[in-house]
């Protein structure tokens, strides 16, 4: 029998894969989505779920009730017929003998009987041992006495010198002694036999007594099972609901009985007749079967329109019922939900149909699916080989651009010596063995976006490593990107013409990160090239084509095109321009393109050399004009038939993007972190921490980690010494973290990323303020926040000496306004080195209260003379910000 995967098992039981994997983990089994599940693991999970939901004890008796409703047409008065509903109820009871209890009782009986027999045997052996010891003692005394008598006789015989005693008195004494000895032995044996018989009788009586008691207990258990009732539902919630219904029914019967009893307490003959009638009614039918008249209420069946997701409260509003009714219905179906819990479309459909309503399913992206399904591929499934798409990666100054320039000059025709426009970021070259498409993307942003969206636009990664520099941080990052995208990696060792080139060092450093050359037993191809002389470039291209043959890259050439956006920009004269790498089909001028959040009709197409073209096949990069806006790098581009529908899909995607952006703004900030704790799981507050010195960093880290509780955990995902960089901001945005700067500031690139990603950035100068505010956020009782707002920034251009004031900084105000009354900080390389106040603020020898942006001024810092050229003087003010939950 084939093994069942976790994904297939989740489909069978009607649960999500994530929920099933979580239940496997709780049961002590680690599984992934594609892992197989054995029968033993299924049984282990079932036992764990039964234990969690109180389903360990299987029912020994269950009652099934079946109700059938039919309609009978009955002739009425005046020849008119009317429909009468006939309801038939059937009850069947099934009794399951509990074999485990009988086996347990039998084991207990055998154990008790064995214990009784062992006890009796031990007592008998102890008594026999004591008697044997007494007998041995008597025999020893008799033997000693006999020896003494023998010695006395021998002495007497020696004295009288008689060799044989033939006197009758001696013979009689000997015979009497033998008789007494035999009688004593017989009495001892008889006594032992009597004791053994008594012990055996006692053990038999004890076993008989226990057997009667066990039989009585078994009879009582069977009698109790005979009159007991077990429900088929093992869920605690469902049993509680049924028990509550039974109690309500019993209370109604009790109230009816009390009412009848109250009527009969008036005395006399009527009271006696009432009691007799009451007893007769009790004997004939139970109270719950009494007939009554209820005003008929027609059930309203509605058409419920259900989207992809809906909450319990929204579903109740759609069906015009209370939310508690839906919660009860879900409890009967074996699921425990809350009023704000989100239900998937299938679950909501089952609940609505169970409550008698008609369900109309709504697909929110139905139009998008319809537009994409209308794409026909004229070539059918005919696949043809295509050129490989190669991404060049490497550390800065390792010769990546030089290598690309040499390949371009060597492989592009002489008439195209002008080369390509570098901002396009993609081009293809023709070799003797085939065509290769290169992606020249600065950094790894486009590659990461494409990998995250599953576009698989890159087939091979060429890692450029300088032979004289070795592995650097961006080299390691490129290796991680290639491994995460499951893309083959070819290493190009550049700068081989330099005398400092060390091949073994490069191989050794790369092997530490999982990249092994074929010479060392690995599977990564190494090419040793020189972008300056061109040595080894042909070998690199042959290696790329060889790897492409192994991958067997194929694509559909005919039909409507589909691709991915490599780069996009807004040109002042041409409008939105997008560079698209065609992955399948043929892209033609005049096609309607749906590209992420944008759409449009292709007005013009250009290749990487800037020449106009009319069509482009697979693995060909092309520039297109005519989109409604600038798409994002990594968006999928698809050719559709109808421009009106393409516009509707683009508008729908823009609306969804706005919803996602609003949701991202509710990420883990200090103001709403405690509000996110809606479930009983442990929440994490992610923090990116930067400080000015290592000592402060360690102190803050230890203090923050000590704030972790059972409900909230502080997780410092990155920490370091120095200014906040763009890498820190990107990491904080990806992990929903807050950025904390202790006496450091963020640079310009980091501030831009922080603003675009809406990352929460905090500056502190006192460790106690940092700890207290994080603690206040974790407890959910945040006091009003005093925020330091930077109002001006001045750059020191020159330093003058004053006999009265000391060092005077000649500054240019670059941002905001410098005020005399506001406190200041002195920054050197974006690190706070002094915090104080202004002593003097002058402009053209005149004291002024403030100096605005773009003006020069002289600043004297109180109690600080170590001002240097290039320092920054930051002016801030403390403002109170009302905090909302």
Swiss-Prot record:
Function: One of the essential components for the initiation of protein synthesis. Protects formylmethionyl-tRNA from spontaneous hydrolysis and promotes its binding to the 30S ribosomal subunits. Also involved in the hydrolysis of GTP during the formation of the 70S ribosomal complex.
Region ranges (G1): 394-401
Classification via PROSITE patterns: G_TR_2, IF2
GO CC annotations, alphabetized: cytoplasm; cytosol
Every tr-type G domain range: 385-554
Top-level taxon of the source organism: Bacteria
Region (G2): 419-423
HAMAP family hit by this protein: IF_2_B
Annotated segments matching region G3: 440-443
Listed name of the protein: Translation initiation factor IF-2
Keywords noted in UniProt: Cytoplasm, GTP-binding, Initiation factor, Nucleotide-binding, Protein biosynthesis
Organism: Shewanella oneidensis (strain ATCC 700550 / JCM 31522 / CIP 106686 / LMG 19005 / NCIMB 14063 / MR-1)
Family the entry assigns: Belongs to the TRAFAC class translation factor GTPase superfamily. Classic translation factor GTPase family. IF-2 subfamily.
Bias type Basic residues, positions: 253-266
GO biological process: translational initiation
UniProt-listed InterPro entries: DNA-bd_dom_put_sf (IPR009061), EF-G-like_DII (IPR053905), EFTu-like_2 (IPR004161), IF2_assoc_dom_bac (IPR013575), IF2_II (IPR044145), IF2_N (IPR006847), P-loop_NTPase (IPR027417), Small_GTP-bd (IPR005225)
GTP-binding among keywords: yes
Residues covered by region (Disordered): 123-289
């Amino acid at each position: 029998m084939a093994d069942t995967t976790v994904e297939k098992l989740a489909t069978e039981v009607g649960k999500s894969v994530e929920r099933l994997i979580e239940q496997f983990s709780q049961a002590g089994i680690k599984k992934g989505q594609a892992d197989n599940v054995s029968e033993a693991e299924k049984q282990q999970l079932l036992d764990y779920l039964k234990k969690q939901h109180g389903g360990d004890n299987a029912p020994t008796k269950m009652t099934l009730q079946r109700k059938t409703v039919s309609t009978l047409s009955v002739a009425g008065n005046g020849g008119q017929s009317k429909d009468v509903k006939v309801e038939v109820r059937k009850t069947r009871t099934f009794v399951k003998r509990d074999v485990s209890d009988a086996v347990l009782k039998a084991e207990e009986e055998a154990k008790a009987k064995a214990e009784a027999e062992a006890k009796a045997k031990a007592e008998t052996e102890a008594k026999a041992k004591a008697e044997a010891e007494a007998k041995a003692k008597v025999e020893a005394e008799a033997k000693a006495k006999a020896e003494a008598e023998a010695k006395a006789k021998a002495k007497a015989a020696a004295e009288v010198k008689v060799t044989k005693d033939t006197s009758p008195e001696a013979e009689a004494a000997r015979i009497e002694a033998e008789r007494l000895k035999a009688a004593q032995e017989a009495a001892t044996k008889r006594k032992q036999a009597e004791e053994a018989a008594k012990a055996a009788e006692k053990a038999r009586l004890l076993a008989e007594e226990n057997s009667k008691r066990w039989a009585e207990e078994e009879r009582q258990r069977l009698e109790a099972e005979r009159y007991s009732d077990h429900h088929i539902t093992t869920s605690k919630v469902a049993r509680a609901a049924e028990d509550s219904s039974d109690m309500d029914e019993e209370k109604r019967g009790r109230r009816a009985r009390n009412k009848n009893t109250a009527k009969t307490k008036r005395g006399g003959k009527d009271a006696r007749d009432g009691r007799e009638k009451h007893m007769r009614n009790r004997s004939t039918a139970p109270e719950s079967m009494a007939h009554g008249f209820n005003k008929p209420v027609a059930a309203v069946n509605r058409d419920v329109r259900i989207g992809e997701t809906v909450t319990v409260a929204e579903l109740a509003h759609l069906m015009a019922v209370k939310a508690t009714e839906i919660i009860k219905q879900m409890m009967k179906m074996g699921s425990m939900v809350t009023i704000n819990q989100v239900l998937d479309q299938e679950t909501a459909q089952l609940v609505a149909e169970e409550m008698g309503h008609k369900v109309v399913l709504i697909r929110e992206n139905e139009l998008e699916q319809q537009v994409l399904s209308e794409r026909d591929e004229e070539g059918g499934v005919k696949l043809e080989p295509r050129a490989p798409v190669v991404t060049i990666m490497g550390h800065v100054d390792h010769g990546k651009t030089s290598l690309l320039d040499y390949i371009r000059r060597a492989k592009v025709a002489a008439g195209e010596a002008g080369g390509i426009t570098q901002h396009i970021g993609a081009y293809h070259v023709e070799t003797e063995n085939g065509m290769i498409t290169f992606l020249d993307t600065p950094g790894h942003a486009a590659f990461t976006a494409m990998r995250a969206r599953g576009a698989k636009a890159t087939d091979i990664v060429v890692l450029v490593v300088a032979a004289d520099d070795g592995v650097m941080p961006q080299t390691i990052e490129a290796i991680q990107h290639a491994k995460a995208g499951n893309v083959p990696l070819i290493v190009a060792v550049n700068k081989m013409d330099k005398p400092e080139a060390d091949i073994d060092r490069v191989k050794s450093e790369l092997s530490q990160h999982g990249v092994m050359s074929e010479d060392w037993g690995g599977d990564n191809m190494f090419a040793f090239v020189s972008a300056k002389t061109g040595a080894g470039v042909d070998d690199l291209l042959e290696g790329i084509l060889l790897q492409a043959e192994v991958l067997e890259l194929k694509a559909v050439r005919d039909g409507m095109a589909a691709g991915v956006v490599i780069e996009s920009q807004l040109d002042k004269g041409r409008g939105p321009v997008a560079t698209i790498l065609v992955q399948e089909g043929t892209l033609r001028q005049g096609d309607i393109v749906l590209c992420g959040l944008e759409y449009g009709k292709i007005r013009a197409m250009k290749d990487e050399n800037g020449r106009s073209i009319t069509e482009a096949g697979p693995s060909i990069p092309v520039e297109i004009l005519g989109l409604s806006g600038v798409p994002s790098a990594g968006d999928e581009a698809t050719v559709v038939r109808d421009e009106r529908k393409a516009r509707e899909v683009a508008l729908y995607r823009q609306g969804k993007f706005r919803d996602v952006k609003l949701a991202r703004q509710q990420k883990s900030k200090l103001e709403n972190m405690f509000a996110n704790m809606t479930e009983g799981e442990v929440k994490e507050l992610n923090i990116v921490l930067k400080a000015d010195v290592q000592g402060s960093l360690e102190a803050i880290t230890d203090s923050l980690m000590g704030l972790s509780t059972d409900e909230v955990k502080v997780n410092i995902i990155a920490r370091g010494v120095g200014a906040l960089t763009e890498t820190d901001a990107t990491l904080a945005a990806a992990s929903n973290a807050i950025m904390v700067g202790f006496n450091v500031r963020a640079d310009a690139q980091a501030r831009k990323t922080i603003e675009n990603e809406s990352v929460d950035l905090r500056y502190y100068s006192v460790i106690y303020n940092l700890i207290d505010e994080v603690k206040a956020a974790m407890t959910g009782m945040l006091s009003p926040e005093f925020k330091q707002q930077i109002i001006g920034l001045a750059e020191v251009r020159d330093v003058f000496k004053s006999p009265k004031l000391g060092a005077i900084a000649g500054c240019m105000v670059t941002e905001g306004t410098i005020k005399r009354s506001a406190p200041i900080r002195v920054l050197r390389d974006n690190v706070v080195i002094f915090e104080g106040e202004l002593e003097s603020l002058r402009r053209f020898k005149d004291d002024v209260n403030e100096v605005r942006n773009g003006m020069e001024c002289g600043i004297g810092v109180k109690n600080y003379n170590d001002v240097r050229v290039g320092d920054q003087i930051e002016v801030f003010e403390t403002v109170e910000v009302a905090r909302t939950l």
